[in-house]
A protein has these predicted regions:
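Nucleotide-state-sensitive switch-loop elements of NTP-binding domains
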Residues: 1-66, 70-71, 83-86
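The feature captures the short pre-catalytic strand/loop hairpin that immediately precedes
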Residues: 24, 160-162
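A short acidic, often aromatic-flanked loop/helix-cap motif at beta-alpha or helix-coil junctions
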Residues: 30-32, 154-159
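Alpha-helical scaffold segments in soluble metabolic enzymes
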Residues: 43-50, 103, 138, 182, ...
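Conserved catalytic-core segment of NTP-binding enzymes
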Residues: 50-61, 66-150, 159
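Short, hydrophobic alpha-helical segments
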Residues: 184-195
Length: 197
């Protein structure tokens, strides 16, 4: 929305259909050093509702990719305002990533008794650091959840990104694409178990 002089009033101005019919909406945020990124998330969610995004596209599943810095209440807005049913934490075994993942899990726990989104599990996005699997498993156990998927670190992801495409589009027969398909099925199964999709 930052590219617009004024807030866009049409969904088509902030959305784009990508590979495989996936609808992508990039809302951006405030100018660096100015404004509140958490407020940007709130504004984005309100804009999706105002423009009728959910009614127009009737998505099977909605994924929000938000920063892991949940000390700001705005970053927890999708789960607090009923926009999310499950929270999946994507982390590597790097110490700062584990710390951010723990903060997200704590935020979900803090809201547990209010009927907000539940912690659905952890996804390991490998960076090939020492004790990576053990640290991520410990994180899952600390918050009484499970590791629902494990992704290999692959340069193919970066290669596809450099081409402005998804890995599935550039390398559909790769081992990484297979890992993504398996993870997608695991996420759908998690939703089906709770009658969410």
């Amino acid at each position: 929305m930052r590219e617009e002089d004024e807030e866009p009033d049409e969904l088509s101005l902030i959305s784009k259909e990508g590979y495989g019919g996936i609808l992508c909406i990039e809302t951006g945020g405030p100018t660096p050093g100015l404004g509140c990124a958490g407020r940007g998330i709130i504004t984005a969610l309100e804009k999706l509702k105002e423009t009728g995004a959910y009614e127009t596209y009737k998505p099977d599943i909605v994924l929000y990719d938000v920063l892991g810095d949940v000390v700001c209440g705005g970053f927890s807005m999708p789960m607090r305002k009923g926009y999310a049913d499950k929270v999946l934490i994507i982390t590597s075994g790097e110490n700062m990533a584990i710390h951010a993942g723990a903060n997200i899990a704590m935020a979900v726990q803090n809201f547990r008794n209010r009927g907000y989104a539940a912690l659905g599990g952890i996804i390991l996005n490998r960076r090939n650091v020492k004790r990576e699997e053990e640290k991520v498993q410990e994180l899952a156990e600390d918050f009484e959840t499970k590791v629902i998927g494990k992704l290999t670190h692959s340069d193919l992801v970066t290669d596809a990104e450099e081409q402005g495409k998804t890995l599935m589009e550039c390398y559909p027969e790769s081992e990484m694409a297979t890992e993504y398909r398996i993870l997608a099925e695991q996420i759908l199964n998690l939703c089906r178990e709770d009658g969410l999709c």
